[in-house]
């Protein structure tokens, strides 16, 4: 059995579960949105039973791999209004869930600890180290530094957050002169500021174990391609040099799955923008026909042989931030060298 930690409302979870079922491999979607709202979990003597609100039940101890598809926000009863109580309950759920997952000692896609470690600050640093081009980047909460940065790039600057705002999608935005008026709020929390890359071609890369799928689209002047769901996508043939460096980045970060955003500048060079260990791929698959779902099923059931050969090993020469990873199958999956077309 494959455990998919997500939500029953998540199309990605349902589609991959269906692909696994077609192969005769059962999958159980553990709905983390039901924590505090109908889910029942019990661990005893090596068994872990998970019951969903719809009555479906599974013994998670029989799991052969876990896809940590989505983080969770417990759906607590509004009557639990005290912030301290809610935070205490959230921590209880967090320890129970991830402690139980690590105790399984099976392949994790991706290890939840490593997913958290793959922050924008770390991934930008690691991308530079392995030779990927990265736009000039400033991460700061200092207004004067931002103004100097904007002046240096003659106003051609974009800005984005380091993380998400709960369940909201926060898009990357182009610097506007009026943004200077809001810099007094920057003291509260840092943000990312980058030079705006010239060029209108963006490549969405999906890495699944050894396989790499790339799709190109025209941004049509938009700063954040995610804002245009109707943009036409076409299969893109990445240069082998870029493929090798993306694989190296995945290995250094200890990730088996991620989506990567690249921008092609006016000279045809590829620039690394960001990586998402839980990025979406269905819209790319639907528009291009790339078999990403099948690749994910292969990875989870173990047909990605190179990934299995890397079981129980930390990434080669990992960044220091990953060396404190907790015990468990923290690096069973690593990227290899096959380019899927």
Question: Predicted segment positions?
Answer:
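Conserved N-proximal alpha/beta basic substrate-recognition cap immediately N-terminal to
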Residues: 7-23, 28-133
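Short acidic-glycine loop/turn motifs at beta-strand connectors
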Residues: 44-45, 53-54, 207-211, 265-268
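A long amphipathic alpha-helix within ATP-dependent nucleotide-binding catalytic cores
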Residues: 187, 195, 207, 223-270, ...
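A short beta-strand motif that forms the metal-chelation/ATP-contact edge
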Residues: 205-207, 268-283
């Amino acid at each position: 059995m494959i455990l998919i930690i997500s939500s029953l409302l998540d199309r990605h979870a349902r589609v991959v579960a269906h692909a696994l079922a077609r192969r005769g491999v059962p999958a159980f979607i553990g709905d983390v949105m039901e924590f505090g709202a109908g889910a029942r979990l019990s661990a005893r003597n090596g068994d872990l039973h998970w019951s969903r609100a719809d009555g479906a039940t599974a013994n998670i101890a029989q799991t052969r791999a876990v896809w940590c598809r989505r983080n969770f926000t417990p759906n607590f009863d509004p009557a639990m209004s005290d912030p301290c109580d809610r935070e205490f309950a959230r921590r209880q759920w967090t320890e129970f869930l991830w402690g139980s997952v690590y105790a399984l000692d099976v392949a994790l896609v991706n290890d939840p600890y490593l997913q958290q470690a793959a922050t924008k600050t770390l991934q930008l640093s690691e991308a530079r180290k392995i030779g990927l081009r990265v736009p000039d980047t400033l991460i700061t909460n200092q207004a004067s530094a931002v103004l100097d940065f904007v002046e240096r790039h003659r106003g051609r600057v974009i800005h984005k957050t380091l993380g998400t705002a709960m369940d909201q999608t926060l898009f990357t935005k182009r610097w506007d002169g009026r943004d200077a008026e809001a810099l007094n709020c920057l003291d509260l929390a840092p943000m990312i500021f980058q030079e705006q890359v010239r060029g209108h071609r963006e490549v969405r890369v999906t890495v699944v174990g050894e396989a790499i799928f790339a799709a190109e689209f025209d941004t049509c002047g938009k700063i954040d391609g995610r804002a245009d769901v109707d943009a036409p996508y076409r299969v893109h043939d990445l240069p082998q040099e870029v493929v090798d460096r993306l694989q190296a980045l995945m290995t250094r970060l200890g990730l088996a799955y991620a989506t990567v955003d690249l921008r092609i500048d006016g000279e045809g060079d590829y620039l690394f923008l960001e990586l998402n260990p839980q990025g979406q791929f269905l819209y790319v698959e639907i528009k291009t026909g790339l078999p990403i779902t099948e690749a994910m099923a292969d990875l989870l059931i173990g047909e990605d042989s190179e990934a299995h050969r890397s079981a129980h090993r930390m990434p080669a020469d990992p960044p220091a931030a990953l060396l404190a990873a907790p015990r468990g199958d923290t690096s069973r999956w690593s990227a290899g060298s096959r380019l899927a077309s």
